[in-house]
Amino acid sequence: KYLASLLSGIVLFGAVACSSNDDTVKDTAKPVITDEGITANPVDCQVYNRGESISFRYRFTDNQELGNYNLEIHNNFDHHTHGTQGQSCELDQKKEATKNAFYYNKDFSIPSGSKAYDASQEIKIPATAEPGDYHFVIRVTDQTGNQQIRAMAIKIK
């Protein structure tokens, strides 16, 4: 009787441990970075002056739940690309960056449970920033880790 109970327990454990839940659907959809319904900023080829602020405005959406976003500004003095730019812009001559090349990189949270979020930030360009070509990069991640990237070429005068 003990052996039968032990054998039944092992079989039951094996059935539970090996069962799969095919009803679970993994979220593989990337979040969306859009200007739909808002006036987005910045856009490709936009020009800013040193000492001014960039008024960042974009809408993010996701099929399940947004997570967070990151904004990065880095120099494009070497004319590299990110493959997400909407249009090509007139570039200055290639050059080496100096210590005054502007660099910005900051993470921002999105309220829990959000499927849509209108993001806005004011980013001050230092008066001492090196003029030239820059990339403004937006990264949005949803709660399951899917990420969308959008990079725009901007110029600082």
Protein language model regions, located:
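Bacterial Sec-dependent N-terminal signal peptides
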Residues: Y2-L3, G9-T39
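Generic early N-terminus positional signal peaking at residue ~5-7
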Residues: A4-S5, R150
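First exposed extracellular module after export/assembly in secreted or surface-exposed proteins
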Residues: D27-K157
